[in-house]
Amino acid sequence: MAKTNQAITICSLLLLLLLSETTSHLLCSDSKTPVNNNETLQFCDSYKERSCCNSKDDLQLQNRFNSMNISDSNCSSLLKSILCSKCDEFSGQLFGDDDSSLVPILCNSTSQDLCSKLWDSCQNISIVSSPFSPTLLGGATSPSTSSNSSTLTDLWKSQTEFCTAFGGPSQTNNNKTKCFNGEPVNRDTSDDDEDDVKTPKGICLEKIGTGSYLNMVAHPDGSNRAFFSNQPGKIWLGTIPDQDSGKPMEIDESTPFVDITDQVSFDTQFGMMGMAFHPKFAENGRFFASFNCDKVKSPGCSGRCACNSDVNCDPSKLPKDDGTTPCRYQTVVSEYTANGTSSSPSTAKIGKASEVRRIFTMGLPYSSSHGGQILFGPDGYLYLMTGDGGGVSDTHNFAQNKKSLLGKILRLDVDVMPSVSEISKLGLWGNYSIPKNNPFQGNENEQPEIWALGLRNPWRCSFDSERPDYFLCADVGKDTYEEVDIITMGGNYGWRTYEGPYVFSPLSPFGENVSSDSNLTFPILGYNHSEVNKHEGSASIIGGYFYRSNTDPCSYGTYLYADLYANAMWAAIESPEDSGNFTDSLIPFSCSKDSPMKCTAAPGGASSGPALGYIYSFGQDNNKDIHLLTSSGVYRIVRPSRCNLACSKENTTASAGKQNPAGSAPPQPLPSSARKLCFSVFLLLSLLMMFLTLLD
């Protein structure tokens, strides 16, 4: 028995270690965003404002509760609260990654916490189809019992064993883990401590390149190399210098990695808009380009028009846009390869410009607002950002129409390829399959590719490298407002019903200006056009990244973004941490006097900062250093002291960490999914060893 208790104690400690790594981002257990209740929940009536349940969910939970046939009132009340925790706005954290579970993490730090109360009240009470069966935890064994009705003591040997399986620590100032204690979880509004993120005094830059690029992607092999591309359709492979080395980046523009300019239609609105390298590029050599093509000049370019009968749109009735017929220009995602150009894809210095396969093709009704960024998410799927298609204020309200792929975030599986017959049967737009948990599958009135909707022209999205459930996208506004959104599964971001937080009144009579899904998600950040360009009122947001490099410790944890016109940059802070509540500040930026390449001062003198021209995009290398891709060159964020900026966290006696040579990955924290996998393996091995010890 002593050995058994020791084993249980060890398992409890391991569980605490796992739980300490979780976050409290407002997210439902099904990965959707909590919504404001438009109607009172009759059963789970404790959740009155924002929740993860609608009336249908509420009824299902009530029916499940009634079927348990619990005779004791105290036990019954606790079981009701546990079932209703599915409606909690923090249920994504309460249930971890298991949406199928009916039991959240139960608070278990003291005898007054829910797990102890539940055992005391319910241990000898019969529960039909008990949600506490060990078999529901996956692989655990339990004493012989009826599968229909059982008590806790039928299923578990002791309170300790039960609470080890279902319990977790209560939240404290040092422990931000969420557990369920019988009531709706409150947001953490405790005062910031000295380690919390603060707004930096400013941003210090150095110029390391003269090229004008639209996209930057770190080499998937984890080295100090990165890919850069321009709008006409060329991709280069460059080498990023060490911080404090005084060297510019190495890139030979006379020898591109790949040149697809003959496939790309390029002008001010069109071109190569995005590129993505497969997470296993170093092994399989697969990479992808998102661009526009002209079907008049390229016969192989043609695809289905986004203006079609399914969305009540007739392309023959659309007016010409700048003299161009509707759907002459297409949005294309094509796959290419670096295989066969060197001994391994990781060492390849050139790729092949011939298309391996066409992943996606869609005709554009107008010539503006077509997005085009692509990136691989931490889940391994390819995300494609599409604009609303242009026209006068989203003429046909495509962004709110779930039969249209315009104004959306699409999520595609490019590892499982369908047959030609499957593409036709499913009505796909190319060679890809649909991830199983995409939110709009199984309904003929909704496109299964859609991950999120209600966007006007998303321009630069990124996942937080430390918290993969934070997927932020900047969305370019029309007349008034630029915004940043946290993208979640099935989220609706309002356009054209709203422009940012403002109700939008379109000039076009086409399409109902009301979403069939009234649960809209509003921006976490944004700014009015007049804030950045008071004379003309012009603005165009450029989405950025959470700063996760050690180079500037005073910027660590902030979300950085900017405006196209290069005279405004913001640092946003989330407070409390993992709450989804952000505040931002305009921050000054300057160029280091010892920059490897000279920075030209903006009009108004050195105090006005460097003349960046236009900011096209941000980039992030494998050391998490942030780069600005501008019309005047490539700039990198460096140590604050190089611009005489005060930062108490900076160690000025030691230079920043060295970059990683080609082929060597930098040491980075494991993502949460990897930590959980490692924990599971470690736990199983530990249990096995303890079991073998008991046999001795």
UniProtKB/Swiss-Prot annotation:
Its cofactor is pyrroloquinoline quinone. GO terms for molecular function: oxidoreductase activity. InterPro entries: 6-blade_b-propeller_TolB-like (IPR011042), Glc/Sorbosone_DH (IPR012938), Quinoprot_gluc/sorb_DH_b-prop (IPR011041). It comes from the Eukaryota. A lipid is attached at S672 (GPI-anchor amidated serine). SUPFAM superfamilies: Soluble quinoprotein glucose dehydrogenase. The keyword Nucleotide-binding does not apply. Transmembrane segments: none annotated. Residues 673-696 form a propeptide. Belongs to the PQQ oxidoreductase GdhB family. This is HIPL2 protein.
